[in-house]
Amino acid sequence: MKKYWLILPGLLALFLLFLLTRGPLSLRRLDDHPLYVMHYAGDYAFDDYLRTGIYPDQPITPVETDETEAWGCTTFAALSMDGERLLGRNFDWYADHPALLLFTDPPGGYASVAMVDLSYLGYRGDEIGMFERAALAHAPYLPFDGMNEKGVAVGMMAVPFGNGTLDPALRTLEDVEIIRLVLDYAASVDQAVELLENYNVRFNPEVPLHYLIADAGGDSAVVEYVGGELRVLRNEQPWQVATNFIISTQAPRGATASCWRYNKAFQALADAQGALSGPQALTLLESVSQAGSFPTIWSVVYNLTSGEVSVVMDRNYQQIYTFHLKRTDTP
C-alpha cells in the first residue's frame, strides 16, 4: 500500500500537466480582444453525436445574440499550381465577441485547427477564470472556419436566404456543425461534398449560411442550400471567392457582383491567377476588411500546403499570430 502512496503525487502531477497543456486548462490569452488559444486533447464524442443525434454530457444551447443584421464575411481560395494553396477569411461581426483558436485531434478523425466565436458559449470580453471553463468542452462543436491535417479548409458566410435539406432519412446537423463534420472526416473537397450529402442542415432562420471549401490538391467549392436542395459550385479557375450573396442563383461574371468585397477579392485573385503568398493573402484580406458597426473581428489565412495558420485580430495587420498544424499526406 505504501508504494501506491509514493507514486500518487507523481500521477497527480502528470494529470495536472495534461490538463494544463492539453485541455480546458491549457487556455491561453494572447491579446486584449481577447483572442485565446487552446489544445483540446482526446474525444469530444462527435462521432457518437453523428450516430445518435445526442450531445455528450448535455445539450449545447448557444447563447442568443441579435442576428437581425447579416455577417459581412469574405472568404477566398488561392489555388495556383505555381505556389502554395491558401484559404483566407475575414469574419465580420460584433466587435466585443471573444475568439478562440482551437486545436483538436480526435480519435478516428483528423487533427484540425479552427476559429470559434466564444460569445456563443456565453463568454464575453472578461478574463475566463479557471472555474469558468466548463463550456469550453463544447467548443469543438462551434467552429466558424478551420483547416485539417489533410489540407482541407472551410469558411462560412451569411446569406440573405437559404433552406437546409429536410430528408427524413438523414440526421440533421446545425449550421456550424457541418464545418466540424468536414474538418474531422474529409481529406478532399470531393469527400466533403459526399459527407454533406448524407446529412440535413438546420440554419438559424435569421442568418442562413453558405460555405467555401478548399483542399491542398487545388479544388474548391461553394456549397449552398436553396429550396431544400444542396447546390455545389466548383472552382473553374485556380481561385474562388464567396461573400454574402447566393451564387447559385445569381452567379456574377468576373468581378461584377453587387458586393464590393467580392469584386475586389475576385479581381486581385484573377490578376494573380490564384498565386498568392501568405503575406499577400493577408494584404488582400486587409483590403476587404471593414470598420463600423460590424467590423472585421479576425482575419485568418490557412496554408493548405504547409499547415501554417496566420491570425490577425481587430484589423491590426502589424500584429500577426502564427501557428502550425502538422500536415499529413492526402491519400
Model regions and ranges:
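Single-pass type I membrane protein transmembrane segment
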Residues: 9-10
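A surface/extracellular/periplasmic glyco- and lipid-processing/surface-interacting theme
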Residues: 154, 161-289, 294-296
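N-terminal mature-domain region immediately after signal-peptide cleavage
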Residues: 5, 14-180, 184-186, 201, ...
